[in-house]
Amino acid sequence: RARVTKLERREKRFFIQTERGPIQAESILVGTSGYTGNAIKKLQKKVIPIGSFIIATERLSDELAYQLSPKNRMIFDSMHYLNYFRLWDNRMIFGGRAAFFPENKNTIGRSAEILRREMIRVYPQLKDVKIDYVWGGTLDFAFDMMTHVGEVDGMYYSLGYAGHGVAMASHLGKTVAEAMMKGNIKE
């Protein structure tokens, strides 16, 4: 992984400068999601980077874990900016959009507090449970809340997963790569 600092297209080749060195390619697929940077301004304007954060509790007793999720299933609510949660290793893993800013030291700490409140709203029996871990990442939302796949200036892209990238990015990555090989993709 290396951040792209400059991107140019000359004739039929792309010249890409990264923090780790230069790359040349005949075609490229941009799948940067919330990390789409200044080097690709036309795509950066298509999405809004938003933080997504997760907390993990201390290990819970078998009895409490069963009480919270008898079938140990992944759960999410139906809010527009949803929360999602499940048990793993007898820990409650609880995530959501606690802050609309990309992750940094301040947003991670504040997000842990917000997610803890949300977790206790859903599971009041966790009010005295300690939070062992918190982390975050940056995802992207398109202005129309839809995933966008297409080609701009000869670059193929897939962006705007709105928190569904784990499932959709794998599928669309394969689909776009196949379309690139055939040369037939339009937004």
Q: In which residue ranges do the predicted regions lie?
A:
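Short beta-strand segments that buttress and anchor functional surface loops
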Residues: I16-T18, G160-Y161
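Flavin (FAD/FMN) cofactor-binding and adjacent substrate-gating region
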Residues: E11
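Conserved ATP-binding module of the ATP-grasp superfamily
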Residues: R1
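Active-site substrate-recognition segment that forms the wall
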Residues: V4, F14, G21-D62, Y66-D153
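C-terminal lid/capping helical subdomain adjacent to the catalytic/cofactor pocket in oxidative enzymes
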Residues: V152-E187
